[in-house]
Structure formats: C-alpha cells, structure tokens
Amino acid sequence: MHDYYSDDNIILKLTFEFSLLIIEYTEKLESQTKYILARQLFGSGTSIGANANEAQNAESKADFIHKMKIAAKKGEETFYWLSLCKQSPNYPDCDFLIEKLIIINRIIGKIIFSSKK
C-alpha cells in the first residue's frame, strides 16, 4: 500500500491529487445533469492514477512499461474529454485540470522513456 501524499513517488502523488480533482469536477457536471461526459471523464481521469499505482507492483520491467503506457493512454483520453468540456458552452471551467494533466502526461512519458533504457 502506498502513501499517496508522499514525495517519494511524485507520479503517484500527482495522479492521486488529480483523481480527487476529477471526482470534484465530475460531481459538478452531474449536478448540471451532464451525466454522460461526467462518467467518461471520471473513468479515464481516475484510471491514470490507478494504472500508475498498479505499475508499482509490476511483474517485470516490460509489465511496468506496459502499465505506464496504459496510464499514458488514459491521460490522452482524459485530455480529450477535458477539451470537449472546455469548448462546450455552459460547462464549468476546467483549465486548471488541463494544466495539471499536461504535467502528469509529460512525467509519465519521461518515466516510460527512461524505463526503456
């Protein structure tokens, strides 16, 4: 079990904090009856951290890279849903989520790249 607020593993910390923000944001969407997008965003946005966490117990280096690649894919999917929210009228502001996600996606990309060496 991991301490998600520890600075020992920055990607776990950032993705856990991001998941909490996604929960809060999707609750706002649901309160505005924007259920379909809320569910899509909730699933992909929280999956980034879940996959990064699962990678910590990978059976091999290849398994670790594979799980981190899934986290990267979920990051890209989340970026898509947030971009839709940003461009759609009457949706709550999500710029802060996009900014945090860009950082997370870059870190995951660097982790994957450095793990391949």
Language-model features, listed with the residues they occupy:
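Short, C-terminally biased terminal segments at protein or domain edges
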Residues: 1-54, 58-117
